[in-house]
A protein has these predicted regions:
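FMN-binding flavodoxin-like domain, especially the glycine-rich phosphate-binding loop
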Residues: 3-4, 9-16, 20-30, 40-130
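Conserved SAM/SAH-binding loop
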Residues: 32-36
Length: 130
């Protein structure tokens, strides 16, 4: 099963969770603000993560989702960290489903203060889809 992990993080919490998910999947977590983030080969599971910034997704993540080729992704699984709101999960889901990419109902949401030391939680979450 092929897997990829993509994320955008300003403060490092979402990056930390992305790296835990990637370790569980045996892949590298890649920030969407890098050229390496492009999905060039089809993946069965794409973990996508981000947070809410000023009531929306960061422009890097939003743009990357807009450019994502739906034919390259069999299913997306969402994760997010934030201080107060899970709304980033809804916004990512909307963008992906609008492209015709199936999105897993289960998501991983951690409040920012919970992200540190969340390795076991993130790995257990990832293993459900691998």
């Amino acid at each position: 099963m092929s897997t990829a992990v993509r994320y955008y993080s300003r403060g490092g919490k979402t990056k930390e969770v992305a790296e835990y998910l990637a370790q569980a999947a045996g892949v590298q977590a890649v920030s969407v603000d890098t050229q390496a983030a492009a999905i060039k080969e089809p993946v069965d599971v794409l973990f996508v993560g981000g947070a809410l910034y000023a009531y929306g997704l960061d422009k890097h993540l939003s743009s990357w989702l807009d450019d994502l080729d739906a034919k390259m992704v069999k299913k997306a699984v969402l994760f997010s960290t934030s201080w107060i709101s899970k709304h980033a999960l809804d916004l990512m889901r909307e963008k992906l489903t609008a492209k015709g990419i199936p999105v897993e109902e289960k998501t991983l949401y951690l409040k920012s203060k919970e992200a540190a030391g969340s390795r076991q939680t993130a790995e257990a979450f990832a293993k459900q889809f691998l």
